[in-house]
């Protein structure tokens, strides 16, 4: 039976972590073999609603805090589990604000340059060919 790579269910993982965890989380993902990562700076808050700081002696409630958001697309529940575990292990401090991880099933992925879709769109090319 022929294996159709486009029948693979793609899973998108979004992780929002502390800004200072960027390098460690990126390294952990690379170390387990994740080869496609999008990361960008965001601001946000959880149920704690940010934090309080003192500016010129006045208490100021900071409503949002700087974070890093990672977006990763994987091709199996095993990769989803491995990716989540790597992020959790690396980003954990045990304090409020460690972040959140969300997963979604993707309807489609398209590589703009080649037109490849689904599983084929997220694979790293072999530049030796």
Model-predicted regions and their roles:
Residues 1-129:
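Positively charged, small/polar-rich N-terminal and surface patches that mediate targeting and assembly
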């Amino acid at each position: 039976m022929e294996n159709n790579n486009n029948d693979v269910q793609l899973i998108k993982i979004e992780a929002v972590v502390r800004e200072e965890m960027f390098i460690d989380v990126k390294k952990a993902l690379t170390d387990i073999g994740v080869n496609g990562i999008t990361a960008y700076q965001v601001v946000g808050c959880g149920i704690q609603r940010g934090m309080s700081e003192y500016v010129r002696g006045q208490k100021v409630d900071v409503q949002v805090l700087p974070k890093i958001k990672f977006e990763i697309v994987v091709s199996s529940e095993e990769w989803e589990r491995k990716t989540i575990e790597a992020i959790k292990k690396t980003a954990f401090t045990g304090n409020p604000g460690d972040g959140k991880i969300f997963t979604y099933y993707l309807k489609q992925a398209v590589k703009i340059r080649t037109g490849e879709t689904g599983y084929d769109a997220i694979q790293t090319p072999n530049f030796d060919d």
